[in-house]
Design a protein with these regions (language model features):
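Bacterial N-terminal signal peptides
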Residues: 1-7
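Carbohydrate-interacting regions of secretory-pathway proteins
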Residues: 10-187
């Protein structure tokens, strides 16, 4: 039912590219700009021996939207998509606190916890290959799909507010993650 509602609200609305495949135009890092680059049509977030954190934020802010992207990583990665603020994130990779993969699960930074866990991710996630993620954010409702299968249906108790989208390089982790085909459809 929730996927039908999301599809109905997208009729006639074209997605907008968040990344041109060549530059970081439209994005700004919170810190450590050297952690962010473009390589082979992808945004690359890569930490160094300092293992400091950085978030690459869109310059534009969004209310309700559908975010679509592809991501790829190998090894230990603790990353994700920040949605409208730094308190709500959809995880990619190993949770630092839980020490296991929590890809597609929401993390609430202000509360320091995962309120729910995405289902079926282990069977869908392809480590070292490109994975497709789609996150619908409408009011307090989050719906997530991984490689075409719905894995998350979550309602937050946080008040929604307009804000940017962020890509994360988590502190205290030596990691590299690639993002491409980033697009957003305002709802």
């Amino acid at each position: 039912m929730s996927l039908l509602l999301c599809a109905a609200s997208l009729e006639g609305v074209e997605p907008v590219a968040l990344f041109d495949g060549k530059t970081l135009s439209g994005w700004k890092p919170s810190a450590m700009p050297e952690y962010w680059s473009v390589k082979e049509d992808a945004i690359v977030g890569k930490s160094d021996a300092q293992k400091k954190g950085s978030i690459l934020w869109t310059e534009a802010a969004y209310d309700d939207f559908v975010l679509e992207a592809e991501f790829r990583y190998e090894g230990h990665v603790d990353s994700g998509f920040f949605l409208r603020n730094e308190n709500e994130q959809i995880q990619i990779g190993i949770s630092g606190s839980l020490k296991r993969d929590m890809t597609c699960s929401p993390y609430i930074g202000k509360k320091g916890k995962y309120p729910v866990e995405a289902v079926g991710v282990k069977d869908l996630l392809k480590i070292g290959e490109w994975n497709r993620i789609k996150i619908s954010v409408k009011g307090k409702k989050y719906i997530g799909t991984l490689n075409g299968k719905q894995v998350l249906d979550y309602t937050t108790d946080m008040e929604p507010a307009k804000g940017p989208i962020g890509l994360q390089v988590h502190p205290n982790v030596l990691m590299e993650i690639h993002f491409r085909a980033l697009k957003i459809t305002p709802l």
